[in-house]
Design a protein with these regions (language model features):
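A short helix-loop-beta-strand connector motif used in the catalytic cores of GNAT acetyltransferases and
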Residues: 41-53
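Conserved acyl-CoA
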Residues: 96-113
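Conserved beta-strand-loop-alpha-helix junction that forms the acyl-donor binding cleft
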Residues: 114-128, 147-148
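Conserved GNAT-fold acetyl-CoA-binding loop/helix
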Residues: 21-40
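A short, internal acetyl-CoA/4′-phosphopantetheine-binding micro-motif in the GNAT/acyltransferase core
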Residues: 82-92
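Conserved beta-strand in the GNAT
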Residues: 53, 59-69
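A short beta-loop-alpha structural element at the N-terminal edge
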Residues: 1-15
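A conserved beta-turn-beta hairpin within the catalytic core of GNAT-like acetyltransferases
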Residues: 70-81, 140
């Protein structure tokens, strides 16, 4: 079941973020649980954020977190993904999570652009790119990171 996240989901969302973080290019950046908990709660409560979960058999197996912000060159807004992850058990829920995000962004007043990325290196990036393209996204470039020690 895909549903809007609630405060009771924070621990489950944190578990997925920690799992995904261990696979990401940023895995050497220490994850701070207190900061993560606070930020997930803010996202759940904020009208400018979008948080939905995929729940299977009482467990959170996928999550999509997005946000809107004003474009730096316009009075219009952009919606972008902050975190998108589905466990092996939740495979297949990703498209539904993404559809909900896109629908939310399109219904959000002032949003003129939806930006999606595959910047963390988590999971099958090519599969995620294909999902984005099926949803109507157009590839516009690449992202590079300079890891710091």
């Amino acid at each position: 079941m895909i549903r809007k996240a609630e405060n009771k989901d924070i621990s489950g969302i944190m578990k997925l973020v920690k799992e995904a973080h261990s696979f990401s290019i940023s895995r050497f950046v220490k994850l701070d649980s207190k900061t993560l908990r606070t930020n997930v709660q803010v996202c759940i409560l904020s009208a400018e954020h979008f948080v939905v979960v995929a729940e299977l058999e009482g467990k959170i197996e996928g999550v999509m977190i997005g946000v809107t912000h004003q474009l730096w060159y316009s009075r219009k807004k952009q919606a972008t993904d902050l975190f998108f992850y589905v466990t092996e058990k939740g495979t297949g829920a990703g498209a539904n999570l993404m559809r909900r995000f896109i629908s939310w962004a399109k219904d959000n007043p002032g949003v003129k652009e939806i930006m999606l990325g595959t910047t963390s290196g988590i999971g099958d990036v090519e599969r995620t790119k294909k999902l984005y393209e099926r949803m109507g996204a157009v590839r516009i470039g690449d992202t590079f990171v300079l890891p710091q020690e």
